Amino acid sequence: MSGFSLADLERIVDERSKASPEQSWTAKLVAGGQPKAAKKLGEEAIEAVMAAATGDRDNLTYEAADVLYHLLVVLKIAEIPLENVMAELERRTAQSGLKEKANRQSS
């Protein structure tokens, strides 16, 4: 198993976002703003869904990587650190998913 983590990818996205948009796809996405980055995330998510629905494991792996990357770009633009997302996941996993969902609906 690889030692590469989402935190590693977040650091790379941060570094590359500071480059020239002519030199870095990440910088180009960031310079294009949230609407462009969010649209690209949506496109990649649809491609991942299609790969999952057709049982194409190799393509699903590829598209899942794209989704994670583009999600981190969207989070970068929104100035939401991955740590915040992980804390939310940790909070949610402290109880069953059904209970957590019921609590959200009653709020």
UniProtKB/Swiss-Prot annotation:
The protein's Enzyme Commission number = 3.6.1.31
Q: Name one Pfam family in it.
A: PRA-PH
EC class of the enzyme, as a word? hydrolase
Keyword vocabulary terms for this entry: Amino-acid biosynthesis, ATP-binding, Cytoplasm, Histidine biosynthesis, Hydrolase, Nucleotide-binding
CDD domains for this protein: NTP-PPase_HisIE_like
So, what pathway does this thing act in?
Amino-acid biosynthesis; L-histidine biosynthesis; L-histidine from 5-phospho-alpha-D-ribose 1-diphosphate: step 2/9
GO terms under cellular component: cytoplasm
Task: State its location(s).
Answer: Cytoplasm
What GO terms describe the biological role, i.e. biological process, of this protein? L-histidine biosynthetic process
Molecular function (Gene Ontology), one example? phosphoribosyl-ATP diphosphatase activity
Q: Which reaction does it catalyse?
A: 1-(5-phospho-beta-D-ribosyl)-ATP + H2O = 1-(5-phospho-beta-D-ribosyl)-5'-AMP + diphosphate + H(+)
| Entries under PANTHER family matching the protein | HISTIDINE BIOSYNTHESIS BIFUNCTIONAL PROTEIN, HISTIDINE BIOSYNTHESIS BIFUNCTIONAL PROTEIN HIS7
Family per record: Belongs to the PRA-PH family.
Q: What is this protein called?
A: Phosphoribosyl-ATP pyrophosphatase
- Per the UniProt record, the source organism is Rhizobium etli (strain CIAT 652)
